[in-house]
Design a protein with these regions (language model features):
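Active-site cores that bind ATP or allylic diphosphates and position pyrophosphate for catalysis
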Residues: 1-32
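Catalytic adenosine-cofactor/nucleotide-binding cores of aminoacyl-tRNA synthetases and other
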Residues: 61-160, 263-291, 295-299
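Basic, alpha-helical terminal appendages of large translation-related enzymes
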Residues: 115, 181, 186, 196-340
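Short active-site loop/helix that positions an aromatic residue
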Residues: 1-9, 39-49
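Secondary-structure capping and boundary motifs in well-ordered enzyme cores
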Residues: 29-34, 92-96, 122-133, 164-172, ...
Length: 340
C-alpha cells in the first residue's frame, strides 16, 4: 500500500481506488513461502482498515540459478545493472534484449513447480525461439512483400483461398480468445507459448505456400501473383496480430513491429487482436529490420564465469574462537544437594 501511495504522490493520482474501490480487482502475486500471510493474516489487516480483499492469490514456486538456490549473501544472483551493461545498452542489443529477458523469465516461470534460470537456456530461448521463429517469420513476410508486392499490402482474393489459407486465418482469429483465457487463468507461460506458436504457424504456412517459387511461375501461371498476394496478405495480417498478442510479454518488440508496419501504437489495443483487417490493402510498409540478434556462445560463457567468480569472491569468512576451558566435573552427591 505504501508503494501505491508513493506512486500516486509522484504522479499526482489518487491511490485509494486501487485499495478501497469495490470495483477494483486486486490480485496478489506471491511466492509459495508467503501463502499463509497473504491468505489469512494480510486479508484480516486489509478488512480492518477498510481495504478491499484480493480476488485471487496466485503463488509461484521458487526459481533457482544455475543448479543452486539464489543467495545474496553468497553472491549467487543476477545483477540487473550487469544485464543492462552487457545486453541492453544500444551497442550490445538495445531494448530488444530487455524483451529477451522478460520472455525467458516468463517461459521458465515457476508457476507449478520449481524452475531454474540457466544462461544456456536464456541463449536458447533467444536464438531458437525469438530469432528463429518469431523474428524470422516477421522478417520473411516483410522481405517478400517488398520483393513480390512492391512494398505494399496486397489484396486478398477470396475465390482462391484453399484449406490451408482458411486454417491459418482461423488460427489468427482464435488467437485472442486462447491467449486471453490463459492470461485470465494466470497461466502466463502457456499464454506466451500460444503467441510464439502463432508465429510458428505462420512460418509453416509460408513454407508450404512457397511464394518465392510462385514468383518464378508468373509467366506460365496466370493465378501465380494472386496466390502470392493471398499468402503475403495473410502473413502480414498475422504479423500485425503478433504485435498485439506479444505486447504483454514483449512490449518493446511490439512497438518495433508497429514502426515497421507504419501503424500507430493504438493498434495494440487488445480488442483489435484476432482481426484480419488490421492492415489496409495498398498500404506501404517500411523495409524490414531484424527484431532480435543472436546471442553468441562467448557472451554466455562470460556470464557464467562472471557468476562463478562473484560467488568465489564473496565466500563467507568463518570466524573461529577458542572454546572455553572445561570446568572440573562434580560427583552426583554434590549435584543432589542443589535445591531445584
Amino acid at each position: 500500500i505504501s508503494a501505491t501511495k508513493q506512486w500516486a504522490l509522484n504522479t499526482g493520482k489518487d491511490w485509494k481506488p486501487y485499495w478501497e474501490d469495490q470495483d477494483t480487482k486486486l490480485i496478489h502475486f506471491i511466492g509459495k513461502d508467503n501463502i499463509v500471510f497473504h491468505c489469512i493474516i494480510f486479508p484480516v489487516m486489509l478488512q480492518l482498515h477498510g481495504n478491499i480483499l484480493p480476488t485471487n492469490v496466485p503463488a509461484n514456486e521458487f526459481m533457482n540459478l544455475e543448479g543452486d538456490k539464489m543467495s545474496t549473501s553468497r553472491n549467487w544472483k543476477l545483477e540487473m545493472e550487469d544485464y543492462i551493461n552487457d545486453f541492453i545498452k544500444p551497442e550490445n542489443g538495445g531494448s530488444q534484449l530487455a524483451d529477451t529477458l522478460r520472455y525467458y523469465l516468463t517461459a521458465i516461470a515457476p508457476e507449478s513447480k520449481d524452475s531454474e534460470f540457466t544462461w544456456k537456456g536464456f541463449q536458447d530461448a533467444n536464438n531458437s525461439e525469438l530469432v528463429s521463429i518469431f523474428g524470422n517469420f516477421i522478417n520473411r513476410a516483410l522481405v517478400l512483400m517488398h520483393k513480390l508486392c512492391n512494398g505494399k499490402v496486397p489484396p486478398l482474393h477470396n475465390e482462391l483461398l484453399d484449406e490451408l489459407d482458411h486454417a491459418t486465418i482461423e488460427a489468427i482469429q482464435q488467437s485472442k480468445q486462447k491467449v486471453e483465457q490463459l492470461l485470465e487463468d494466470y497461466k502466463f507461460r502457456d499464454a506466451q507459448f500460444e503467441v510464439i506458436n502463432l508465429a510458428r504457424i505462420g512460418n509453416q504456412y509460408m513454407q508450404k505456400k512457397e511464394p518465392w517459387i510462385l514468383a518464378k511461375q508468373l509467366e506460365s501461371n496466370p493465378s501465380a501473383q494472386q496466390l502470392i498476394n493471398n499468402c503475403l496478405h495473410i502473413c502480414l495480417q498475422l504479423t500485425a496480430n503478433l504485435a498485439i498478442l506479444s505486447n504483454p510479454f514483449l512490449p518493446f518488440t511490439a512497438k518495433k513491429i508497429c514502426y515497421l508496419l507504419k501503424v500507430v501504437d493504438k493498434i495494440l489495443d487488445w480488442e483489435n487482436a484476432g482481426s484480419m483487417k488490421l492492415l489496409s490493402v495498398g498500404y506501404s510498409l517500411r523495409a524490414p529490420e531484424l527484431l532480435f540478434r543472436k546471442i553468441e556462445d562467448e557472451e554466455i560463457t562470460k556470464q557464467i564465469e562472471k557468476l562463478k567468480a562473484a560467488a568465489v569472491n564473496k565466500e563467507p569468512i568463518v570466524q573461529t574462537t577458542p572454546a572455553p576451558a572445561v570446568k572440573p566435573e562434580i560427583v552426583f552427591d554434590d549435584f543432589a544437594k542443589i535445591d531445584l
